[in-house]
């Protein structure tokens, strides 16, 4: 879902990377890329240019793909898959290898959210880093878990109980010099300090 180019919101380029040996070789259908594209399209007002990649669990390939997407101007890069303790799970190592700064709070919050659902969340090793002017975040491998960690936990009436990690993404991207991301509150309300909130632009 991409809004019209006449939108009053800043355009953003987002890299989405699904990491799976079997999906990348056609053994089964990849569900990570569609889940990421669907959620982001519903969560953001901004016009989005997606840069999708489906790659195997190879550390060098993952690192090279992340660097490629950063160099291509992606302000945000989200990965899915390869963050567990299995021998082939190397996404965190590949991500840290290209980092200029680590952002440990994202991984900590994702594990706290997932622990509300499954005790095995403590086996997750997701990390987040900044490289140049890009924020790179590892997400879980399952579409349901992707949505839960991005959105957080809500009660039956839709009130936020535990913030999802995406609430902090727009302000982080502000701080590293990226576009001004604006979220749909019903999906995920972005948090910014009052002095960082931009007045609405007039529609073109």
Predicted ranges, named:
Residues 1-204:
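Non-catalytic beta/alpha edge segments that cap or flank active sites
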């Amino acid at each position: 879902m991409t809004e019209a180019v006449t939108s009053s919101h800043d355009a953003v380029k987002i890299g989405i990377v699904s990491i799976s040996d079997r999906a990348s070789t056609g053994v089964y259908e990849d569900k990570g890329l569609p889940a990421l594209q669907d959620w982001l399209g519903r969560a953001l007002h901004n016009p989005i240019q997606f840069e999708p990649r489906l790659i195997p669990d190879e550390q060098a390939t993952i690192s090279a793909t992340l660097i490629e997407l950063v160099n291509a101007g992606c302000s945000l890069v989200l990965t899915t898959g390869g963050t567990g303790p299995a021998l082939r799970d190397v996404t965190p190592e590949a991500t840290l290898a290209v980092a200029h700064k680590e952002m440990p709070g994202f991984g900590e919050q994702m594990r706290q959210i997932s622990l509300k659902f499954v005790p095995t969340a403590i086996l997750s090793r997701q990390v987040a880093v900044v490289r140049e002017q890009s924020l790179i975040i590892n997400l879980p491998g399952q579409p349901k878990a992707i949505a839960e960690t991005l959105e957080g936990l809500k009660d039956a009436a839709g009130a936020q109980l535990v913030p999802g990690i995406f609430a902090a993404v727009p302000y982080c991207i502000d701080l590293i010099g990226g576009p001004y991301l604006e979220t749909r509150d019903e999906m995920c309300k972005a948090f910014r300090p009052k002095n960082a909130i931009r007045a609405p632009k007039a529609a073109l």
